[in-house]
């Protein structure tokens, strides 16, 4: 699905070749809405997708998640040692993706004194573009660990008590598997604001918190630090997001493809 594969799938449909699309988000894009009228299957990851597609074509598969996250084996102490953190203070993981998330980074930068005063540790993944500036800002705060990119996300997820992230479909699917309390700051720079809709779907199930991008610099860390003082609410969020995990999504999608090949 999506605009990149749209012409190929459209040509296949015109030629009578069976097609499948996977809609990863909670709000279907324009191309998938068009393609969805003639596909054999639509593999989805959110409830309510009959708003966009023929209900008979919809199969709830979830979104594939990389095996390293599905099968995390590292222990807590090993993860803490990797980042040079301790078990006595809570840990916030801030994830901006490989390119970084400007507003999220600005929110951390504006809150370093507040974070230090709260006695909280932070793993701050900035993206390459913001790394040097963030490293300079955090150099006076030894409990804030700055990385441009984290290859060992299994360690980061294991160490974290709360995770701050954008709300892309793949990221949300990973975080459902991880099952930690999450605060989402959806990117406003995406088609049809689909990240906000992704996050709202979790908020509606009490499975995450949502801070609009426009409010993040003022409120993100107030909300996050306040949440750290509410262990029962943290547990509720963790339990509810974990309940949304679909660890065998890739297998389900493959099964749908195989079934169509055999019909």
Where are each of the predicted segments found?
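Conserved donor-binding/catalytic loop of nucleotide-activated donor transferases
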Residues: 15, 158-160, 174-185, 205
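An aromatic- and histidine-rich active-site surface loop
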Residues: 1-15
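A short, well-ordered alpha-helix in the C-terminal region of glycosyltransferases
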Residues: 81, 233-247
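Active-site-proximal region of nucleotide-activated glycan assembly enzymes
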Residues: 13-76, 85
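C-terminal alpha-helical cap of glycosyltransferases
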Residues: 246-263
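Short alpha-helical segment that forms part of, or immediately flanks, the ligand-binding pocket
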Residues: 10, 154, 172-180, 200
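Donor-nucleotide binding loops and adjacent catalytic segments primarily
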Residues: 74-163, 195-199, 204, 211-220
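Short hydrophobic beta-strand element within catalytic cores of glycosyltransferases
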Residues: 165, 181-192
